């Protein structure tokens, strides 16, 4: 997430009113399911094709690892960036483990230089308060809370149009300080995030001025207190014109 924690608390106005009760299990659209032909984009041995602040990023026990300490704090939110291509229409699978604090997976994002990234973020935090939300780093802030189906209008304002899962069940399914899996799917302006097999958000972004149809992939190491985050089993499926 963004450095300012206050933006985290800007809950979507009227979300509770607009939310719809879950009457049946949410089903990801057929065109967004499956990852046949996915390829590994992290070799588990070194940081080939990945670019991050060397002081903070390394490979430990087969996992990409970001660490800050009291003696070596991050100067601000810093990211390790995949240099192997850009994300357009895709399905991404990532195993992750967070010991404390906050991190996230940036996708279709912008490289601002010096390992600073802005854009869509699949969020995660040590208490699972924000894990699963869609956040826009350096932009519109919280786009969708956990469990919500959201349409972002041309004016940039998110509107809850339905429910995709129960937020408490999502939180209960997250294994604190242990390995979890994120699946992120982007097709056109439609974005879906899943954690441990449960859909956390479903977003249609109709804000043509601020949405991103393509961009980079990166992982966040958040400014603030000491933290450790790890990523492994990173696979990417790229969808062509169909």
Language-model-detected regions and their locations in the chain:
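N-terminal secretory signal peptides and thylakoid transit peptides that target proteins
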Residues: 2-19
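Carbohydrate-interacting regions of secretory-pathway proteins
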Residues: 3, 31-242
């Amino acid at each position: 997430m963004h450095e300012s924690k206050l933006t985290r608390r800007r809950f979507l106005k009227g979300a509770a009113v607009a939310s719809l009760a879950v009457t049946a299990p949410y089903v990801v659209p057929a065109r967004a399911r499956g990852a046949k032909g996915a390829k590994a984009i992290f070799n588990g041995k070194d940081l080939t094709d990945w670019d991050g602040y060397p002081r903070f990023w390394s490979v430990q026990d087969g996992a990409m690892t970001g660490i800050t300490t009291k003696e070596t704090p991050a100067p601000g939110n810093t990211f390790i960036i995949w240099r192997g291509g850009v994300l357009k229409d895709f399905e991404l699978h990532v195993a992750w483990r967070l010991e404390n604090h906050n991190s996230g997976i940036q996708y279709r994002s912008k490289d601002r230089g010096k390992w600073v990234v802005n854009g869509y973020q699949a969020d995660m935090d040590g208490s699972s308060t924000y894990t699963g939300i869609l956040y826009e780093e350096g932009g519109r802030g919280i786009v969708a809370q956990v469990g919500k189906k959201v349409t972002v209008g041309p004016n940039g304002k998110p509107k809850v149009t339905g429910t995709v899962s129960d937020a408490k069940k999502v939180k209960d399914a997250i294994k604190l300080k242990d390995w979890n899996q994120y699946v992120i799917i982007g097709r056109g302006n439609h974005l879906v995030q899943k954690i441990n097999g449960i859909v956390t958000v479903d977003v249609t972004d109709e804000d043509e001025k601020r949405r991103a149809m393509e961009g980079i992939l990166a992982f966040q190491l958040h400014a603030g207190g000491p933290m450790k985050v790890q990523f492994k089993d990173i696979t990417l499926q790229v969808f062509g014109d169909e």
